[in-house]
Amino acid sequence: MLAPATNDMVIAARGVTLALGDAAAPTQVLRGIDLEIARGSSVALLGPSGSGKSSLMAVLSGLEQATAGQVLVDGLDFGRLDEDALARARRGRIGIVLQAFHLLPTMTATENVAVPMELAGERDAFARARAELEAVGLGHRLTHYPAQLSGGEQQRVAIARALAPRPALLFADEPTGNLDARTGTEVMDLLFARREAAGATLIVITHDARLAERCERVITLGDGLIVEDRAA
């Protein structure tokens, strides 16, 4: 059995396998992954399409249960938690920023950040939402709806939504994929700055080698395996 994660390791995974598709002939998308990630570090996941990057993120973030192996996140064995307990564990520990912004069009920027926290029973949800939106440079857009915001501004709202609950772990899956080069650089500057201010561990999925080199560690996947693990 995997030893409990130490204070220095926010993620500890051993023998993680994920099989998807037909039970009679499943597709192995992760093949015995062993991985530890230090608390407060920044890690890039590289690899071609189909290499297992998004699947690994899904397992590490609790969105998907591993077929075999063990994943400890902040000392908790996600595989041993029932659905409700897993949802509670993820809520306080994990933030996710995706390529698609996934903002609700009928809610203002503030509401898009605050309402998920409010539904989770968080105190001062709207005050925290406003503070985080100020921090990402959107203090003048608090009452704007997504349709009134540029792509870069919408991604800033998504970053604020992910960081406002103060997660220990922040996952970003191709967060600049829908943005032009200049806006993408600005958003990544912001993402790195805000995660550092929050003390969160950052795991970024990207095809962009330049973005990967901004992280402290680069892990390359191929065919469901880690094929390279190096300092940036």
Label for each model-derived stretch:
Residues 1-19, 227-232:
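ABC-family P-loop ATPase nucleotide-binding domain
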Residues 9-221:
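ABC family nucleotide-binding domain
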Residues 218-230:
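H-loop (His-switch) and adjacent beta-strand-loop-beta switch element
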